[in-house]
Amino acid sequence: TRRLLDKTGLTVDDIALFELNEAFGSQAVYCIEELGIDPERVNPNGGALAIGHPLGVSGTRMAGTLLRALDERGEQRGIVTMCVGGAMGAAALVERS
């Protein structure tokens, strides 16, 4: 997420919503605190622990959830993050035009 923000020249404050793939609650808390994100802007409709993270389509579910939340709130930018095996991760910026 930091690398994505650096590449785009944006800050956490420029992002309305974050869809964080939280396989474990403690991991989500760490990411929120480490990045300085307002918890109210993270997984506003519930995340993987509440909604689920179906095998093979977690990214699709998360991107769709983020897009719907941005539309419902009239917000412009969101970031979706996904964990990848081997302690890796990916983040994507979504911007409504």
Question: Where on the chain are the PLM-derived regions?
Answer:
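Claisen-condensing/thiolase-fold acyl-transfer catalytic domains that form or cleave C-C bonds
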Residues: 1-97
